[in-house]
């Protein structure tokens, strides 16, 4: 959470970093991935503090709601090695199996910080995918297809990221017949 009055600074940071993130190579990547133009929506300067288990909704395993073509892009502003607040991801095959046994509920109060028992019961590997991200690294994934959670930072540490939601342009076109 940002301190009160920080929204102007956050807006300035986001607008300056958006130009850096969506350089020609990244724009070409998204255009090729979607096979059409894309839109960047709802940029957010995200500050995760060491009390994240009590204050931050994404510390439990979940999939985002099914928004057609959504990719999340997290630009890490400080390295995971500094704060330990990594984004853990489960591959699509294991995610589908976890969904089939209701291990990834949409309701916040029913979500889990530990899904190892579900994975064991399903006979699946328990180790999530994680990256040793450095400042300036970009994590891109499909949050409606891949289970994920944010680990809370170590005591006294904070994670700073800018999150961008990227969609194919067609996701926002109304079709009138």
Residue ranges and their predicted role:
Residues 102-103, 138-140, 145-177:
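Non-heme Fe(II)/2-oxoglutarate
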Residues 83-146:
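Double-stranded beta-helix
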Residues 36-40, 62-66, 77-86, 92-94:
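Active-site region of the double-stranded beta-helix
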Residues 66-82, 133, 140, 164-168:
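Short, conserved beta-strand element in jelly-roll/cupin
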Residues 54-59, 71-72, 83-91, 98-102, ...:
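A short secondary-structure junction signal
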Residues 58-65, 145-150:
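Histidine-centered catalytic micro-motifs
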């Amino acid at each position: 959470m940002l301190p009160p009055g920080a929204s102007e600074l956050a807006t300035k940071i986001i607008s300056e970093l958006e130009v850096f993130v969506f350089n020609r190579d990244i724009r070409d990547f998204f255009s090729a991935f979607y096979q059409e133009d894309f839109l960047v929506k709802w940029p957010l300067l995200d500050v995760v503090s060491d009390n994240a288990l009590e204050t931050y909704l994404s510390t439990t395993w979940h999939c985002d709601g099914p928004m057609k073509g959504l990719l999340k892009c997290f630009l890490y502003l400080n390295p995971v090695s500094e704060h330990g607040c990594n984004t853990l991801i489960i591959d699509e095959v294991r995610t589908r199996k976890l969904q089939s046994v209701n291990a990834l509920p949409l309701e916040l109060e029913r979500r889990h910080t530990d899904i190892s028992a579900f994975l064991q019961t399903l006979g699946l590997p328990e180790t999530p995918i994680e990256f040793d991200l450095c400042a300036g690294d970009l994590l891109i994934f499909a949050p409606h297809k891949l289970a994920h959670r944010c680990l809370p930072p170590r005591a006294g540490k904070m994670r700073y990221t800018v999150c961008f939601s990227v969609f194919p342009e067609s996701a926002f076109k109304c079709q009138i017949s």
